[in-house]
């Protein structure tokens, strides 16, 4: 009698499953469940060879890839642990293995694991977590759907390597170690994190662990313990100790290969990896429509028992386990055509395993029998030990699924102990199709454990199952991309876009959407991409990834949240031609609604709504517009309803209340159309009457404003900040003008008739009469009325009369609705209410405002994006095919208990290359690392002109190392077969604390290999620094060379002296790079040096040619240059920039000899060199040929952005204690001139005049005489100065100018600022031309005009004076011009008096001061900082931008930058037509974007508006404005004309105001002004430009304080473009275009308000402008400069008193010579003297007026006296200046040749007197007050 099990085994799988379910329900145990087929539905894996999933694994198998490599240095030092002798203590017999990269990387945040716990977790556990998740995704089972289900986890683990690493560092052990390393925690954590309720079992049977785990999982499924199972295993090789132990058994292959079943078998090679499969009962998988990859028909396990040894295999036990599995699978051995064997390649194990295979699968060889192939994945990836079984299992599953048997590697002939001749078994050496067979394809998998546990599994081809095809392709697909954070959503979108455009290009879009929406986990954050086709989907995904707006893309922040939806129906104004056409074609619900409404519409309105929409013509006339809009709104409502979006309340705006009433059920559609038809026809009679305007005023302010206009009424309460008025057109326009003066929005609203106003009154009786019989019903949906405050409006005739006449209470209705509702959807053809809705609801941040259509965008995509935002998809894609989308992209971070390199002194990764990735295509390689000085501090010892720079030797080493690593040379070995050719440094790389570096090795189509080295700018752009070509040549040793014969003799040079000489040229070699220990110059022009790597330089085995050695060798080339030539310039230095070839023949130790040759190139363009390195054995170790040294100027050395950015910040600085009264009076004794504007036509002017009058009364005293004059009356000002100039009893002490306060109009501010600047320059000219001796101090006084706190807007007029203060500090430092901004709300004159009394104390003076209450603030120049993490949008893809001054040098640079960043349209403003050269640039830009040139002066009315209008014409949104217009006319204040001021002022200041006004209604990301460093730092000769720039700076601050986007950059001079060049060559070096672009990207992204960008020359500032020491504004810069040094020690004029006249004259001459050299840009004094005769006029050397001012200022700083500028400009020589200074110092000059100075000085005085006399003849008598 047959058993129950035997009879059950004869049933079909489905019958057995059905019987099992019945018995389970009956509570009966069913022993034959062990026969039920199990489906493999998902795979996840990571194996050597960059295998990251089943697809890449199969590709590796199909290609026959051998992934074995030398042990990576980050595991252990392979050489240090290697010994071929197995008995060697602590050594292993192999250097090889199969390794997975980045095993220290883990996405802890994704799984909610803290960094501390992640560090303690065994990397095997981490990898299992990620791979298990990937396996579930591959299966199409959302991991989050398994929570609470009977899902089991069975995993094989046996390695404890990480525990060993932990134990080695006992101090780092914490509580997490107890859950981080035990094997049970690996499975327990998966079950815990996914909420799984099935069994979680960790299996350790050594090498069979993972296949035993799969067997147990199948059993658990068959026994109904689980419904889904995750099974597999993991193995990582982190420690050398297991390999050492295995070597003692001679188990490891010395050759590092598994030669399975081959005669060359000599042991196995270890591998590592992880594999997880997802299993379900076949019947359940078919029921659930899962994709079945293969079927497990049967499995079995057993043990070897007592055999030849515990670790020795047992052929009989192996045969038995195979037989059991076949029996339980109910299949015959001959039906199996492939066996994935254990096949380790051991001498003992292979013959024993073959014996068992021959006894089972090998039988039956003969006619008609199909052969059976034997394979072992270990030949590809090594023996994965605990993960070996799952690796073989996955290989078998893929093979039966794809019907192909991959070839077995490393097999040539059978092991002599194996006789396969009588069997059907063979080893495939080539990949082949599966043998044809009558039944399904079958394979088997064996895995045998070290402990004796054996496992065998029979795998079968999956049955054909019908997968429900996707329904007809929807007109749109919704792709839901989910992630735990918005950043993860973005990265998932990027990965998916790349896949869809690459490997997944053939996958139908509907299937992609189906897989995303139905088979992926839904996380906390998700976004949706709506698309019609693949291209649109890819573009949407890329936009989502980049954070850029695009129609059809709903990002993570756009989804509606919270309960309660309100449909809001707009009034008139949303109509447009062609509205609804796309919806008619694409949306059946919309088309049906229109069709059903049309008969009623025709009956009530008189024409067809349906035909109107189909025709797409513009609807004209109020009597047609309003009914059509109501019809559209009703149809759109039905469209929303068709997707299940139902309103909880409705609101209507004006006529929109009709639609709201119909939707709420208060009116039928017939009644609603009747109401709107009657209403609109009556309104048509009044067409053209009245006007309406939108005002940026709240209701109270609007009511107050229109109180004076009785015919103007408040028509609409739009939002808390906006209202609409109605009334006669002329009165409405007057109100608009009044509001505009407040710098608030005010504009007409386009209407046919002004409703909600008495104009409507004549038609109201007829409206009530026509609707008198209307019978409204109680609404089924609440209506929130905008006509009455009533909560229950009745939609009768009276209501509709009031609806037309009463003000629209929209703001109140929305506010009321917002209490209980969170989502507001505007129902209209185009959004017209969203701004009012947002303005009303936004303050609490919990509401979502949406619209239905947008006339600028695709109607269907837009609507479905809105649907997605409320959580409804166009198509749920419930049916479709599961496709293999890319798995979740992990955001890996490194977690390790200690630095892995601590296991060996020899670090794993090359320090200048970093992490290595081999690209899957073309064999390219990429490395990434950080070479910043915090990571590589030794690199900070290589400086060029004070800046740490990556040495060319460093780039060369990177090229060598990259080529060696990529081409197979060991990490610590030289590469004599690798030659670096055509090495070139294209751009220097400045180093800061962290400097990321990317190196790429590229294989070209022409078989050439290139290495390219990049950094990345702050804007994300890659910047290439160095390139080289790589050549593989036959291995060769260096040829014999005469240099190798021994040290040469010649002239010895001290290394210390040589390095000191190099420092003079800007090259600084710190301790790590000062490697020359001996230098000998030879007679033939070459040099020989000895190089010893300093202790400060790092040791690392990966260096092929240590950068310190090569750099020292290159220094040796410099050592061949004569000293005089090296030291010839402090402004340029010879640097290596290219090499023809680099060859390294052998290892170079820490000591080497170098022979360097040098050749000068014709024309002085550079020098060529060659070096040979000879090791201690006398062998040539390396050669570098064709070294090109180029002369590099200081300004060409790049600086990090942080070293170029400045700001002016306010610092609280209490005033010093005021001395006793009488001494204080002494400091202010003398004549004072008080100037103010006598006209008081504005409140600000009156305030200033009043304050001036009060000051005069308070300030006058017996010791102080006070004169007054009108600041704008030039004659009066000059007369006042003339009056005081001749008063010896009251010498001039100070001039106080009171400047008018704020105006309500910026236009008035602009004019006042310009006039004030001009008037103050008049004061300056009067002071300079009238007063001799010590100049009176100039005080500029304003009231509340400067912005101190962020919320203070300030006034540009006052702030523009800061530019003048900065310039006068350099042109007339003795005037000590000071701007004081008083707090007019306190006691301003007390503060001012304190300032004036305190002016004489201290060595430095504050030049910009602000009082706020009793707190005193001063402005200080400081280094700026940026926060790039803010990530504000810079340039949006496809958006429009405007650039004023767009045809200038800077303008075109900005245009190119915008186009490079993806701008769609760039509008350039210019005053003239583009030149031919500019046209060429524009033509190139036109190929990538739309470039439009608008001609006109931006300062002229209408031009700015035209620029904005042009930008908007493209349809793209205007997102940014760059105001770069400028005119530069350098002129000293003394000689400035009003026309000069006007020409400079107009484009910069007036143009800025015009652009500000023109963009008032634009939603900009940024508004950027290009200002000048002159307003921040000062620049003699640029007063007009500095003041205009300061006005622009203040306008930007005013915009920010008003809540508008704005930023300004105070640019220093650019090297190739731009106009402001005054300080070039002295204090400021030029900015390169690349540096400027980097600043643009970074500063806009960081959202800074004001930033100066300039290359300030610290070493020359004090020399050129010694007066900055006396100005506290420059305190921080002076402190920096003091450390940089100046002209050397100078004892001052007192030191001259101790010298005899001849020595004093020489000292004065030498000091002035140094000053002149510095000012005129000569780097060596000898250019002036003695090479130039002492009596040669300086004007013949190229001196100009700006230089003359700086020479005078320098003389004052050095000697306390000054030569007149006129003296310098009128032919004075160095001798003449010396004579004048000697005379003023009271020193007798014995040199009669110096008397020429008298003549020149007399001539200068005569001219000054003539000018003074002419002025006197024009002056009226000034008013005099005081004692």
From Swiss-Prot:
Entry-linked InterPro entries: Ac_transferase_dom_sf, ACP-like_sf, Acyl_transferase_dom, Acyl_Trfase/lysoPLipase, Ketoacyl_synth_AS, Ketoacyl_synth_C, Ketoacyl_synth_N, Malonyl_transacylase_ACP-bd
Keywords for this protein: Fatty acid metabolism, Lipid metabolism, Multifunctional enzyme, NADP, Oxidoreductase, Phosphopantetheine, Phosphoprotein, Transferase
MF terms (GO), sorted A to Z: 3-oxoacyl-[acyl-carrier-protein] synthase activity; fatty acid synthase activity; oxidoreductase activity; phosphopantetheine binding
Species of origin: Mycobacterium tuberculosis (strain CDC 1551 / Oshkosh)
Domain annotation Carrier: ranges: 1706-1785
Acyltransferase as annotated region, ranges: 566-876
Protein name: Phenolphthiocerol/phthiocerol polyketide synthase subunit C
Pathway connected to this protein: Lipid metabolism; fatty acid biosynthesis
Lineage, broadest ranks: Bacteria, Bacillati, Actinomycetota, Actinomycetes, Mycobacteriales
Residues of the active site: 207 (for beta-ketoacyl synthase activity), 342 (for beta-ketoacyl synthase activity), 383 (for beta-ketoacyl synthase activity), 654 (for malonyltransferase activity), 942 (proton acceptor), 1111 (proton donor)
């Amino acid at each position: 009698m047959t058993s129950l099990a035997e009879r059950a085994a004869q049933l079909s799988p489905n019958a057995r499953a059905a019987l099992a379910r019945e018995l389970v329900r009956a509570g009966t145990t069913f022993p034959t469940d062990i026969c039920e087929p199990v489906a493999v539905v998902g795979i996840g894996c990571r194996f050597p060879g960059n295998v990251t999933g089943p697809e890449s694994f199969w590709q590796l198998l199909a290609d026959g890839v051998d992934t074995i490599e030398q042990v990576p240095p980050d595991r252990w030092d392979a050489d240090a642990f290697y010994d071929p002798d197995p008995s060697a203590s602590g050594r292993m017999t192999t250097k090889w293995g199969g390794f997975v990269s980045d095993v220290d990387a883990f996405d802890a945040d994704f799984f909610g694991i803290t960094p501390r716990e992640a560090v303690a977790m065994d990397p095997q556990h981490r990898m299992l977590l990620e791979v298990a998740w990937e396996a579930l995704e591959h299966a199409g089972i959302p991991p989050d759907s398994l929570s609470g289900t009977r899902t089991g986890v069975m995993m094989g683990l046996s390695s404890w390597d990480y525990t060993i690493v932990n134990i080695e560092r006992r101090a780092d052990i914490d509580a997490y170690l107890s859950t981080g390393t035990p094997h049970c925690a690996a499975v327990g954590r998966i079950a815990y994190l996914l909420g799984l309720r099935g069994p979680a079992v960790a299996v350790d049977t050594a090498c069979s662990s993972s296949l035993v785990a799969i067997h147990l999982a199948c059993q658990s499924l068959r026994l109904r313990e689980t419904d889904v199972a995750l099974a597999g295993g993991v193995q990582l090789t982190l420690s050398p100790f297991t390999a050492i132990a295995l070597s003692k058994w001679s188990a490891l292959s010395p050759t590092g290969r598994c030669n399975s079943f081959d005669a060359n078998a000599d042991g196995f090679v270890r591998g590592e990896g992880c594999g997880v499969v997802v299993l379900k009962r076949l019947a359940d998988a078919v029921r659930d429509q899962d994709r079945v990859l293969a079927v497990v028909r049967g499995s079995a396990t057993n043990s070897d028992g007592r055999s030849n040894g515990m670790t020795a295999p047992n052929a009989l036990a192996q045969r038995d386990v195979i037989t059991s599995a076949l029996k339980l699978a109910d299949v015959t051995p001959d039906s199996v055509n492939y066996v994935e064997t254990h096949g380790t390649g051991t001498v003992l194990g292979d013959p024993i395993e073959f014996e068992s295979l021959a006894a089972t699968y090998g039988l039956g060889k003969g006619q008609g029998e199909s052969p059976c192939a034997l394979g072992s994945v270990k030949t590809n990836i090594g023996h994965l030990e605990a993960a070996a079984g799952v690796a073989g299992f996955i290989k078998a599953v893929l093979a039966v699924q794809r019907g192909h048997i991959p070839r077995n590697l490393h097999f040539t002939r059978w092991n002599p102990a194996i006789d396969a001749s009588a069997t059907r078994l063979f080893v495939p050496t080539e990949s082949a199709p599966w043998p044809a067979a009558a039944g399904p394809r079958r394979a088997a998998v064996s895995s045998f454990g070290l402990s004796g546990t054996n496992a065998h599994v029979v795998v079968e081809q999956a049955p054909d199952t019908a997968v429900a095809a996707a329904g007809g392709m929807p007109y749109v697909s919704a792709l839901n991309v989910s992630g735990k954070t918005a950043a993860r959503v973005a990265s998932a979108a990027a990965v998916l876009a790349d896949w869809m455009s690459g490997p997944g290009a053939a996958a139908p879009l509907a299937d992609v959407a189906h897989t995303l929406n139905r088979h992926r986990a839904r996380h906390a954050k998700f976004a949706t991409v709506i698309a019609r086709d693949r291209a649109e989907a890819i573009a949407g995904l890329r936009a989502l990834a980049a954070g850029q707006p695009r129609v059809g893309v709903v990002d993570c922040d756009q989804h509606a949240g919270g309960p309660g939806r309100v449909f809001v129906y707009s009034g008139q104004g949303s109509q447009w031609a062609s509205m609804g056409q796309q919806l008619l074609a694409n949306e059946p619900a919309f088309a049906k609604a229109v069709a059903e409404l049309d008969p009623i519409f025709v009956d009530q309105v008189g024409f067809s709504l349906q035909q109107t929409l189909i025709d797409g013509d513009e609807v004209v006339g109020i009597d047609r517009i309003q009914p059509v809009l109501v019809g559209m709104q009703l149809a759109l409502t039905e469209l929303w309803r068709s997707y299940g979006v139902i309103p909880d309340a409705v609101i209507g705006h004006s006529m929109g209340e009709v639609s709201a009433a119909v939707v709420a059920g208060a009116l039928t559609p017939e009644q609603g159309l009747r109401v709107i038809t009657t209403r609109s026809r009556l309104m048509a009679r009044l067409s053209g009457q009245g006007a309406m305007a939108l005002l940026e005023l709240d209701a109270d302010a609007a009511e107050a404003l229109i109180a004076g206009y009785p015919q103007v009424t408040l028509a609409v309460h739009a939002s808390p900040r906006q209202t609409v008025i109605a009334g006669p057109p002329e009165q409405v326009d007057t109100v608009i003008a009044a509001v505009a003066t407040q710098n608030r929005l005010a504009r007409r609203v386009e209407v046919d008739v002004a409703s909600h106003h008495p104009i409507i009154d004549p038609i109201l009786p007829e409206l009530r009469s026509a609707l008198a019989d209307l019978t409204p019903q109680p609404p089924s949906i609440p209506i929130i009325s905008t006509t009455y405050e009533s909560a229950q409006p009745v939609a009768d005739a009276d209501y509709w009369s009031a609806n037309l006449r009463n003000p629209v209470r929209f703001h109140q209705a929305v506010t009321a609705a917002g209490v209980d509702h969170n989502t507001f959807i505007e129902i209209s053809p185009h959004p017209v209410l969203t701004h009012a809705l947002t303005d009303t609801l936004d303050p609490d941040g919990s509401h979502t405002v949406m619209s239905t259509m947008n006339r600028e965008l695709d109607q269907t995509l837009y609507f479905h994006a809105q649907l997605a935002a409320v959580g409804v998809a166009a198509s749920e894609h419930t049916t479709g095919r599961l496709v293999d989308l890319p798995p979740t992209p992990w955001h890996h971070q490194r977690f390790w208990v200690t630095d892995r390199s601590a296991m060996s002194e020899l670090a794993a990764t090359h320090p200048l290359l970093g992490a290595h990735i081999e690209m899957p295509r073309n064999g390219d390689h990429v490395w990434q690392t950080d070479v910043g000085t915090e990571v590589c501090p030794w690199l900070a010892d290589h400086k060029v002109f004070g800046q740490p720079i990556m040495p060319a030797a460093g780039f060369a080493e990177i090229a060598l190392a990259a080529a060696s690593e990529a081409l197979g040379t060991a990490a610590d070995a030289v590469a004599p077969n690798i030659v670096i050719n055509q090495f070139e440094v294209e751009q220097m790389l400045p180093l800061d604390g962290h400097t990321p570096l990317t190196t790429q090795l590229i294989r070209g189509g022409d078989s050439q290999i290139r290495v390219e080295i990049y950094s990345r700018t702050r804007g994300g752009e890659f910047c290439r620094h160095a390139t080289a070509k790589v050549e593989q040549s036959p291995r060769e040793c260096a040829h014999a060379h005469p240099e190798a014969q021994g040290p040469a003799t010649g002239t010895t040079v001290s290394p210390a002296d040589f390095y000191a000489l190099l420092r003079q040229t800007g090259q600084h070699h710190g301790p790590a790079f000062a490697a020359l220990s001996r230098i000998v110059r030879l007679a033939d022009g070459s040099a020989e040096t000895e190089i010893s790597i300093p202790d400060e330089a790092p040791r690392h085995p990966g260096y092929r040619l240590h950068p310190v050695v090569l750099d020292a060798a290159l220094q040796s080339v410099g050592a061949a240059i004569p000293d005089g030539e090296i030291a010839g310039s402090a402004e340029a230095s010879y640097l290596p920039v290219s090499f023809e070839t680099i060859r390294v023949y052998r290892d170079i130790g820490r000591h080497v000899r170098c022979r360097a040759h040098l050749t000068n190139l014709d024309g002085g363009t550079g020098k060529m060199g060659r070096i040979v390195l000879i090791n201690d054995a006398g062998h040539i170790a390396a050669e570098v040929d064709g070294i090109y040294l180029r002369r590099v100027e200081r300004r060409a050395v790049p600086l990090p952005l942080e070293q170029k950015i400045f700001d002016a910040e306010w610092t609280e600085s209490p005033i010093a204690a005021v001395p006793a009264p009488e001494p204080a009076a002494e400091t202010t004794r003398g004549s004072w001139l008080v100037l103010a504007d006598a006209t008081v036509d504005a409140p600000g002017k009156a305030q200033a005049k009043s304050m001036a009058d009060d000051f005069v009364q308070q300030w006058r005293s017996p010791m102080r005489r006070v004169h007054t004059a009108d600041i704008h009356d030039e004659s009066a000002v000059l007369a006042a100065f003339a009056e005081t100039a001749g008063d010896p009893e009251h010498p001039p002490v100070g001039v106080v100018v009171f400047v008018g306060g704020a105006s309500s109009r910026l236009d008035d501010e602009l004019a006042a600022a310009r006039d004030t600047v001009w008037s103050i320059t008049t004061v300056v000219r009067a002071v300079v031309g009238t007063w001799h001796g010590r100049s009176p101090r100039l005080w500029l006084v304003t009231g509340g005009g400067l912005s101190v706190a962020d919320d203070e807007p300030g006034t540009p007029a006052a702030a523009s004076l800061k530019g003048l203060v900065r310039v006068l500090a350099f042109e007339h430092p003795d005037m000590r011009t000071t701007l004081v901004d008083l707090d007019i709300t306190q006691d301003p004159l007390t503060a001012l008096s304190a300032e004036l009394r305190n002016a004489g104390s201290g060595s430095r003076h504050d030049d910009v001061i602000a009082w706020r209450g009793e707190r005193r603030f001063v402005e200080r120049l400081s280094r700026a900082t940026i926060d790039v993490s803010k990530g504000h949008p810079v340039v949006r893809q496809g958006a429009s931008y405007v650039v004023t001054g767009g045809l200038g040098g800077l303008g075109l640079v900005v245009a190119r930058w915008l186009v490079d960043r993806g701008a769609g349209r760039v509008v350039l403003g210019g005053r003239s037509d583009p030149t031919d050269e500019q046209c060429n640039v524009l033509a190139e830009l036109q190929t990538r974007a739309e470039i439009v040139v608008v001609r006109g002066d931006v300062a002229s009315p209408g031009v700015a508006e035209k620029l904005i209008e042009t930008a908007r014409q493209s349809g793209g949104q205007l997102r940014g404005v760059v105001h770069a217009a400028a005119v530069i006319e350098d002129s000293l204040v003394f000689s400035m004309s009003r026309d000069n001021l006007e020409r400079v002022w107009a484009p910069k200041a007036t143009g800025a105001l015009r652009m500000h006004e023109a963009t008032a209604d634009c939603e900009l990301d940024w508004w950027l002004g290009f200002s000048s460093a002159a307003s921040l730092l000062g620049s003699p000769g640029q007063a007009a430009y500095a003041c205009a720039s300061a006005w622009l700076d203040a306008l930007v601050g005013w915009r920010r304080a008003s809540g508008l986007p704005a930023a300004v950059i105070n640019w220093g001079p650019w090297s190739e473009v731009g106009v402001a060049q005054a300080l070039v060559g002295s204090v400021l070096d030029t900015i390169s275009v690349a540096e400027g672009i980097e600043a643009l990207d970074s500063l806009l992204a960081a959202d800074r308000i004001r930033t100066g960008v300039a290359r300030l020359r610290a070493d020359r500032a004090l020399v050129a402008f010694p007066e900055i020491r006396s100005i506290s504004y420059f305190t921080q810069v002076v402190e920096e400069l003091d450390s940089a040094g100046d002209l050397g020690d100078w004892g001052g004029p007192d030191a001259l008193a101790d010298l005899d006249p001849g020595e004093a004259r020489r000292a004065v001459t030498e000091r002035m010579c140094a000053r002149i050299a510095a000012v005129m840009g000569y780097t060596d004094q000898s250019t002036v003297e003695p090479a130039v005769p002492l009596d040669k006029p300086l004007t013949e050397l190229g001196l100009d007026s700006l230089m003359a001012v700086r020479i005078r200022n320098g003389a004052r700083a050095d000697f306390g006296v000054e030569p007149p500028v006129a003296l310098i400009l009128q032919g004075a020589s160095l001798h003449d200046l010396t004579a004048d200074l000697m005379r003023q110092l009271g020193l007798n000059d014995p040199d009669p040749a110096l008397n020429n100075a008298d003549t020149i000085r007399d001539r200068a005085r005569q001219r000054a007197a003539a000018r003074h006399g002419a002025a006197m003849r024009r002056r009226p008598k000034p008013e005099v007050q005081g004692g």
